[in-house]
UniProtKB/Swiss-Prot annotation:
Span of the signal peptide: none
Protein name: Fructose-1,6-bisphosphatase class 1
Similarity comment text for this entry: Belongs to the FBPase class 1 family.
Taxonomic classification: Bacteria, Pseudomonadati, Pseudomonadota, Gammaproteobacteria, Alteromonadales
Pathway(s): Carbohydrate biosynthesis; gluconeogenesis
GO biological process: fructose 1,6-bisphosphate metabolic process; fructose 6-phosphate metabolic process; fructose metabolic process; gluconeogenesis; sucrose biosynthetic process
Binding site for substrate: D106, G107, S108, S109, N196, K262
EC numbers, comma separated: 3.1.3.11
Organism in which the protein naturally occurs: Shewanella baltica (strain OS195)
Gene Ontology terms: cellular component: cytosol
Amino acid sequence: MQTLTQHLTSQAVNDSLSHLILTLADTSKAISHAVRHGALAGVLGATEQENVQGETQKKLDIITNDMLKDALKADGTVRGLASEEEDHVVEVRQNGQYLVCFDPLDGSSNIDINSLVGTIFSILPAPAGELTETSFLQSGRAQLAAGYVLYGPSTMLALTTGQGVQLFTLDPETNEFLLTNAAMSISPETQEFAINMSNQRFWEAPMQTYIADLLLGKIGPREKSFNMRWIAAMVGDVHRVLSRGGIFTYPSDNKDPKKPYKLRLMYEANPMAFLVEQAGGKASTGYETILDITPTHIHQRVAVILGSANEVDACLSYHGIDSHK
């Protein structure tokens, strides 16, 4: 099996980008160790702090954020970083080539119940000149690489550099990421969907109708039965989609009119959309393709519908969108 280093060389990824990807991968090994030692190390539970989104921070949110910040500051290629846990962008070094956006511990509310969590990252080119928040406001099409690390029964890294999606598994004996799937591919058809049904009464009418038709199964207009899955961690739900197809959606809702969207564009939706498109799937807000959005701020939120291409198209048709035009 190829190691991650060997794979990056075989794909002719340039040295500086390879170095940065390896830094992120190495840090994820340390995060995996911290996650597995959670209760034993006394790092489970919440703090009294909130992040910029107003969410209570878990102890491991802060620990993993600091681990990534420290590693990226030492990497030598990074111009600046943006994190879910940081109010503002962080300048790293003036001659850095890359910007890194990340969610250090996606699904951290799962940590206290020993369920799936992960790290999501996006790498962008650093524009010339002074580093400001505007430097980061590039569409998802500008991403040079993106991926996630899933901390589950095994630790897995899904990665794209624009040449398909590869899956690596951390070998606990050698502490190396080994290539275990050279070409992840999302089947266009599916009978699985993932959504937080507790928000159903708050969704827009198109999404309510779409899900209602899925639940009707064979006796409804879709004429086939669907199964629902929900892990409550985007990294886990998207991993399932990449592994066996499906549609994942976190639509807009009016539960809190000031916060109609849940997922962040820069370090959740964009990297996942890049992975999904590279694996043959589609990713949309319901009204526009995620990777085509020009961000307005680093913590911008969006609706997300992604996964098997034909099922995403079906969902979009309920929103009055003809994806074939």
